[in-house]
A protein has these predicted regions:
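Extended, charged low-complexity segments
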Residues: 124-210
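A glycine-rich, acidic short-motif signal
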Residues: 20, 24-119
């Protein structure tokens, strides 16, 4: 999960989107609720089950990538807590094809992001289907019980391409409060609190550069 989130956060940052803030919020949400599992839904479709009202994008994205064969039959994410992170995790895993997602923002408006091959477009309103017909051929629905509509593009492909080039040449300014949250939990995860966890725990004391 940490690898997927790290790569997704960097991917978002390259396009001027707040990857580190999204990752910090997703981590905080999961730490508060923790319970996430994959369950079979109707018609052989799979989706994450979470005690929290909103599904953890961290684990929804990880489940999608880990259970690659299942995604050919479909996967449903109901109201992800951080849809941008989920989108980036899926986009970086697929590496090709078309990916689209839509969600409700804090002002009750609809926001969306679309990836088609190497082109990236942000929508004011978008559709509720997240697809990649590439090598994996996955089909993921992302819904929030809304009536979705297609609307004009807010930021065109060239604008995002320029952002990406600027990020590579000039770097980006990170949100330090979000980074401190990630640093705190990284330290807790990488420093075992007992000999037993050091020998037998997840990662067994390995260092993850992400």
């Amino acid at each position: 999960v940490s690898d997927l989130v790290a790569v997704a956060s960097r991917w978002l940052r390259l396009y001027g989107l707040p990857g580190e803030t999204v990752a910090a919020r997703a981590l905080t949400n999961w730490l508060e609720h923790r319970s996430v599992a994959v369950q079979a839904l109707d018609n052989g479709v799979f989706g994450p089950k979470c005690e929290n009202r909103k599904a953890s994008a961290m684990f929804a994205g990880a489940a999608l990538v880990d259970h690659e064969p299942l995604t050919n039959r479909g996967m449903v994410i109901q109201s992800p807590d951080e849809p941008l992170l989920l989108l980036a995790m899926v986009a970086t895993a697929f590496e090709s094809g078309t990916t689209m997602i839509a969600w409700r923002d804090l002002d009750s408006g609809l926001q969306g992001l679309r990836i088609e091959d190497s082109r990236y477009t942000i929508f004011a309103r978008s559709i509720d289907r997240l697809q990649s017909p590439g090598q994996i051929g996955a089909n993921l629905s992302c819904t929030a019980d809304l009536d979705w509509e297609t609307a004009p593009v807010l930021i065109n492909d060239q604008t995002l391409s320029t952002r990406r080039e600027t990020a590579y040449s000039k770097g980006v300014e990170l949100d330090r409060s979000s980074i401190s949250i990630l640093d705190r939990w990284a330290a807790a995860a990488l420093v075992p609190d007992s000999e037993r966890s050091h020998d037998k725990g997840a990662g067994a004391g390995r260092i993850d550069s992400n």
